[in-house]
Regions:
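Membrane-proximal amphipathic alpha-helices
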Residues: 1-8
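Short, low-complexity, Pro/Ser/Thr/Gly-rich segments in the mature regions of secreted, periplasmic
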Residues: 151-162
């Protein structure tokens, strides 16, 4: 599960880096709403090197994966809102169709009790949370609409590696 924690921290850093540039020419700085960019675009955190000198925030290792495949035995999904248990309370990260108010991600085991047990969440605040969603965690994570670490989610000491 250490690889998953490192991946979430890399996601956080990549989002912070991504939001320093206007990638779609609309004059607004925003966070990426996808991990993998559409071909020929820079609308996600990873894109193939197209020779323009603009390096994707996530780098080539993430790009070797196929969308939908497990990474370190986990699935990852970007969330575009947060709930009442999150710092700052409940709100959408979207203003119109731009994710400029924050970001979050959930990661859950591809095969519960085989590739992992714990599920994890991170938001723009950079704090990682964990919870055992149980054998139905795949369904629960896919239904998750917002970053909402209530009391059942525990803070992960990332410096200690879990």
């Amino acid at each position: 599960e250490l690889g998953v924690l490192q991946s979430l921290l890399a996601y956080h850093d990549a989002q912070m880096d991504y939001a320093t540039q206007d990638h779609n020419g609309n004059g607004a700085l925003e966070y990426a709403q996808r991990i993998f960019s559409e071909p020929g675009k820079h609308d996600g955190l990873y894109w193939d090197d197209d020779g323009d000198g603009d390096v994707s925030p996530l780098g080539p290792l993430f790009g070797q994966d196929v969308v939908g495949d497990a990474w370190y035995g986990y699935h990852f999904r970007i969330l575009d809102a947060q709930g009442p248990s999150a710092p700052g309370g409940a709100y959408s990260y979207l203003i119109g169709n731009q994710m400029s108010r924050g970001f979050a991600m959930v990661a859950w085991p591809a095969k519960y009790d085989d590739t992992g047990v714990m599920s994890f969440m991170i938001s723009h605040d950079g704090q990682v949370f964990e919870k055992d969603l149980g054998p139905h965690g795949d369904r629960l994570a896919k239904e998750m609409k917002r970053f909402d670490p209530d009391d059942s989610w525990k803070v992960v000491d990332v410096a200690a590696g879990d």
